[in-house]
Amino acid sequence: PVPPDPAWTELPDDGYVRRDGAVIAWRSPSSTSATTPFRLAGAHTDSPCLRVKPSPDGSAVGWKQLAVEVYGGILNNTWLDRDLGIAGRVVGADGAVALLNVAEPVARVPQLAVHLDRDVNSGGLTLDTQQHLTPVWGVGASTPGEFTSWVRGAAEMSSDPAWWELCLYDTQGAAVIGADHSLLASGRLDNQLSCWAATTALAAAEPVDHIAVAVLNDHEEVGSSSNTGAAGPFLEAVLSRIVAARGGGVEELARALAGSSCVSADNAHAVHPNYPERHEPGHRPIVNAGPAIKVNSNQRYATSGDTAAVFQRACEAAGVPWQVFVSRNNMPCGSTIGPITATRLGIATVDVGVPQLSMHSARELCGVDDPGHLAAALGAFLTE
């Protein structure tokens, strides 16, 4: 790790710097200068979820409840009737940070029985996120500070925590499924899968004439506008300091960025067998057929003809297939850190992603081969 506070006068060839939920790591060739360009593999660390509010203790008709806030665009119904653990950061009064992961089931959002909602299967399920997504975590009446005391014990802290950033998550582990073992089911595939691929690729990269970088931003699911998000200064600051550590200034940074390129990796929508009409007929990614290059003429994705060709060459060098994703004209598409990175730094960027089903569900689905396909393609991009 490279500490962020001291001057970066003797920067290691390989290093990383972390800021809260974001990480930037790099590998350098044996010989570099202040104008050596960068090749970046970007992803985001966050996923849609339920986050515990600062004062969560609540009770209703004999049940202990936790007040939670919806983070990002969750699929509401997928959080019902799941055994939920709690994980995140806990901050002490002295500023010390503890990481907490309670992997055993602690809470559950119970669905209303069909006997009490006779029209649910014909009229559809409607959930009020304030009223109907509140989990229970015990029986009886909650007392003020009860959750705080529980966190103190779970995190093995000597005093009550001053603050926390805690998420609920499905405790069911990842599983390879299908009679042919061709599918991978897990929570948070969007976008932990791409984070794994980027870091795996960086660890294996052997750059020759550029600096290989993995940038894992936070807060993409809520717009990226934070000091650790893609719209914030974190990446620009790190790249600027790498250039400065090699004796460069504003001019050298501009030259380094002008020769740089970025692959923004964030999962794509695989064609859904039950809803094929929701997909563009000529651009329907399938699982286990390689990463999809994402294209949007309205710049919701940063892909251009040049950058698409760069990623295609990386796939060919790695021996992995690739495909193309385009949204329907009558169905707006999402966006990624790609356009934000391209806008902030002027770096030529391509958006790609592993095809998956059930995006933003508490439990998602992709092909077992595609994580490896993406890691191999990113490895070739960071090395070639």
Residue ranges of predicted features:
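N-terminal hydrophobic/helix-forming segments and targeting peptides
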Residues: 1-384
